[in-house]
Amino acid sequence: DVDGDGDPDFIGARYKPGLVAWFERPENPLKDEWKMRIADDELIGIHGVLKADVDGDGKLDLLANSGQPTGKFPNSAAWLKVPENPREAKRWKRFIFADKDAPGLSHYLGFGDLNGDGRVDLTLAAKGFPDPKFGKGEWFAWWEAGKDPTKPFKKHLLPGIHPGATNIQPADLNGDGKLDVVASRGHGKGLLWFE
């Protein structure tokens, strides 16, 4: 529910040229047109968007990667704050949390408080480009949120080399009350978890 009117809207993204947009649910969602509004058009190489309350204000924000090595935000990832009036906003406010430190064709995002400090940390994976000069990838990482979520976060690589690294999600897999990380190596490469 992007606009706060009580019904669900849709969020979508385009890879290249990059675009994050939301579609406002009409009165009759089966017959009427869903109006598209742009949230961001400067992130390039978006593989997915995810909603999370990054800044702790009780409202959902959007996460998106900028996985291409070119453009205004190369090899980066961002979160977008939903404006007070999303119907009227030309673009949403963008905060880069991974500032040029996510090379290698980053893919999907996750979130959770990985270090137990009460702040939302963010996760990301990169599978690698066919041409390694653009970034070898093959990593899983998490970005530690600081006191000010509008500033870049601190990157922590998880151990190992991970061909096909695509999905990464925090979850308490062993039931000890602490978040672990489950991660997939796409294209038949496997599934693993980090404690």
Question: Which residues does each predicted region cover?
Answer:
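Beta-propeller-forming repeat regions
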Residues: D1-E195
